[in-house]
Amino acid sequence: MSAPCHCKHVDDSSSNDKLSALSPELQQEFKDPNHPANLICELCRLFYDNNWVTGTGGGISIRDVDGTNPNLVYIAPSGVQKERIQPWEMFLVELPDEKILRTPNDIPKELTKSYKYKPSACTPLFISCYTLRDAGACIHTHSQHAVMVTLFFENEKEFAISHIEQIKALPKLKYNDETGKIEKIGSMEYYDKLVIPIIENTPHEEDLTDSLQEAIKNYPGASAVLVRRHGIYVWGETVWKAKVYNEAIDYLLELAVKMKLAGIPLVKQE
């Protein structure tokens, strides 16, 4: 059960009134507060307040792992103000063929104001996390802490930090030779070293896909990929796990910036 959202960007009663313009099927679908589309709205407002998805940047995608069809993926559209996003504005994609089942352009014009919605440029990167890691959700933010870390380590291909309590919030992952999948075998320990790959930014988001896929394959223990001078992609087995991982990693990135400025090594020598 999700925690209630206390954000004040959108009037919930107004949102409920607008549902009446939708088909009866969609009205029923979006009444569930735990529906992936509603959770994306909730998290977008939270992330906006954290300064992670400002200026229409960033994005969130959720795979309906708890629904009747876990191949259904809900993706926030491109170029919209994340703190004002509504559940009917999501793109609905079905894996593995990546078939678009529904777009916000199908919604009554009185709700969309005839705005022409575009799929998120992050879509191929989100799909990569689902296909390569069997993720339940993927989060992309433009966190300043993520950007700063990639600038501090301008010539490095990875970020590493150890002996910080918050590391324990992240999963310990291992490749299973029998299943051919990356599986969670527990949680990281205080003394473990967290390593996150860094890939180079590109002029267009979708052009990051090959580099992201390569990083995911080369770093089986990672739950995130940093994009230099851009932000970060974080995924998890469920939307709430992805949220926890994203928050924990951002905490560690912020701490790393402060440690670097203070001349404190990020990886403690034994």
UniProtKB/Swiss-Prot annotation:
Pfam families: Aldolase_II. Keywords: Amino-acid biosynthesis, Cytoplasm, Lyase, Metal-binding, Methionine biosynthesis, Zinc. Binds 1 zinc ion per subunit. It is found in: Cytoplasm. Substrate binds at C122. GO terms for molecular function: methylthioribulose 1-phosphate dehydratase activity; zinc ion binding. Pathway: Amino-acid biosynthesis; L-methionine biosynthesis via salvage pathway; L-methionine from S-methyl-5-thio-alpha-D-ribose 1-phosphate: step 2/6. NCBIfam families: salvage_mtnB. Belongs to the aldolase class II family. MtnB subfamily. Catalyzes the dehydration of methylthioribulose-1-phosphate (MTRu-1-P) into 2,3-diketo-5-methylthiopentyl-1-phosphate (DK-MTP-1-P). This is Methylthioribulose-1-phosphate dehydratase. It comes from Candida albicans (strain WO-1) (Yeast). The gene is MDE1.
